[in-house]
Amino acid sequence: SLLTNRYEAELELLVFASWHGTEIVSIPIQVYYPPRKERISHFRPGMDFARISLLNTLLCVLAIIYGLPCRLYRKMVTFLRTAYSLLFFLFFMMVIITPLAWLYIKIGRMTEKKQVRLHELIYHAARFVMIHHGIPGTKFIRKVGGMIIKGKEPVRFDFDKPRIIICNHQSHLDLMCQLVFTPKIVFLTNQWVWNNPTYGFLIRHAEYLPVIEGLEPLMPQLRSLTDRGYSIAVYPEGTRSKDCRIGRFHQGAFYLSQELGLEILPMYLYGPGKILPKKTYHLRKGIFYIEVGNPISRKE
C-alpha cells in the first residue's frame, strides 16, 4: 500500500514504539552490498517522494494529537508512581519502623534475643514492601530450587546455615529484594549507606558493617556473626551497574569464604536496574526477578 512499503513500514513501527515508551536498541548487523554494476535500482522519484511526504505529514499530525498526549501521560504516571513510592517509603521508615526500632533498642539492654527480633523486624518490613504491598507498576518474582515463586508462597530452602551470599548489584532496591528470604542475613555496605539519614540508624544496630579500610579490621565481627548463624551478603562488583551488565568481581567474597570456611550462595538479580537505574530518581514499570542458585563449596 501507499504507506506500508519497505522503509516506510519500518519508520512507522519505530515511531509508534517510541510513542508508547518502548526501548529501542540498536544492533549492528553486517550487510552485503553487491558491486555497483550489479545493483538494480527500484527508485521511482515521483511516487517515492509523494509517499514519503504523505507519510511524514501524517506522522507529524499524529505526533501532535496522539504521540504527545501519550508521552505526557507516561511522564505523569511515572511522576505519580515515584512520588507515591517515595512518600510511602519515608512514612513507613521514618514514622513506623525507625521509631519502633529506636524504642525497642533503647528500652533495656541489647541481648541476642533482641538482636534476632530486630533482624526479624527488618525482614518483615522488606516482605511487606516487596511482596504484600509491592511497588506500583512492578511485579516481584523469586526463583528458588528451580521453582518460580510468586506472591506470598513459602520458600523451601534452608537459609539457616551461614554462608557468604554474593549477588550482582544494579540498584538501591537490590537489598530489599534479598531481605525477603531470611532475617539471618547481614550486609557489607559502603559508608554512604551506613550513614544514611533515613535507615542508617536501623542498619547500624542490625550489625551491617561498612567496608572502609578493607576486610581485615572486620574479621572478628564477621566471625562472631557467622558463629551466631548469620550469612554475610556481599556485592562483589563493589558498585551498581550502569547498564545492568555484570562487572568485574573483586576478591573479597572469595577471601571471606576461605577465611570463614563457608559456602558461597549465589543470587542473580534482574530488573531493579531497569526499574530504578543508577543515577536516576524516577521509578519505571518492570519486573523484579531474583534467583537463588545452588551453594558453591570451598573446593569448587
PLM features per residue range, with description:
Residues 2-81:
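Hydrophobic helical membrane-anchoring modules
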Residues 24, 148-149, 210, 232, ...:
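Hydrophobic beta-strand scaffold residues
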Residues 72-163:
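Membrane-anchoring hydrophobic helices of lipid-metabolizing enzymes
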Residues 151, 209-213, 298:
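Short acidic-hydrophobic, aromatic-tinged amphipathic segments that line or gate anion-handling sites
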